[in-house]
Amino acid sequence: MGMLEARELLCERDERTLFSGLSFTLNAGEWVQITGSNGAGKTTLLRLLTGLSRPDAGEVLWQGQPLHQVRDSYHQNLLWIGHQPGIKTRLTALENLHFYHRDGDTAQCLEALAQAGLAGFDDIPVNQLSAGQQRRVALARLWLTRATLWILDEPFTAIDVNGVDRLTQRMAQHTEQGGIVILTTHQPLNVAESKIRRISLTQTRAA
């Protein structure tokens, strides 16, 4: 039994099948990239895995239990960052981290912002930051969260090369510590091919 399992997932949109019969099992320490052309259903699959959407058929299981039966405990173990940063634009960068991680002290939050490339931006309202900086505020949570499972939709959007490298290193560290990372990205990952498992939506089934 894996930590996260998809069984025979079917997803249809506007009378079109995005994917069907999609099954896979993820274990501790796996780093997974969902691949496929635009419109193949990558974001849709991520939303199914977070429990935000339901498949037309099939099911997603966490530690052997259907998501709808373990929703609370699952979400305690999940960090989801989608296309939109999901941050409070009227709050400062530091206030956002305190909002999402109430048990994190100020020093930890400041260090997370520094790791995300936002040292010195902690007291600036998010609505005054650029799109890339707002993205970094959301991604700073990667240095604070205790969640086992990270699901990230295009995390490198509007992030410069140094930022991408730093985020990639953080993901590698998380998987080395037994966490799971699932992401979509159009950018090549600067890590050994052996570290990345790819699940393609151009095919209907994945092992």
Swiss-Prot record:
Residues 4-207 form the ABC transporter domain. The lineage of its organism: Bacteria, Pseudomonadati, Pseudomonadota, Gammaproteobacteria, Enterobacterales. This is Cytochrome c biogenesis ATP-binding export protein CcmA. ATP binds at G36, S37, N38, G39, A40, G41, K42, T43. It is a peripheral membrane protein. PROSITE patterns: ABC_TRANSPORTER_1, ABC_TRANSPORTER_2, CCMA. It comes from Shigella sonnei (strain Ss046). Belongs to the ABC transporter superfamily. CcmA exporter (TC 3.A.1.107) family. GO terms for cellular component: plasma membrane. Signal peptide: none annotated. GO terms for biological process: cytochrome complex assembly. Its EC number is 7.6.2.5. It is found in: Cell inner membrane. Part of the ABC transporter complex CcmAB involved in the biogenesis of c-type cytochromes; once thought to export heme, this seems not to be the case, but its exact role is uncertain. Responsible for energy coupling to the transport system. The complex is composed of two ATP-binding proteins (CcmA) and two transmembrane proteins (CcmB). It is an enzyme of class 7 (translocase). SUPFAM superfamilies: P-loop containing nucleoside triphosphate hydrolases. Its main location: membrane. It catalyses: heme b(in) + ATP + H2O = heme b(out) + ADP + phosphate + H(+). One of its GO terms (molecular function) is ATP hydrolysis activity. It holds the Pfam family ABC_tran. Keywords: ATP-binding, Cell inner membrane, Cell membrane, Cytochrome c-type biogenesis, Membrane, Nucleotide-binding, Translocase, Transport.
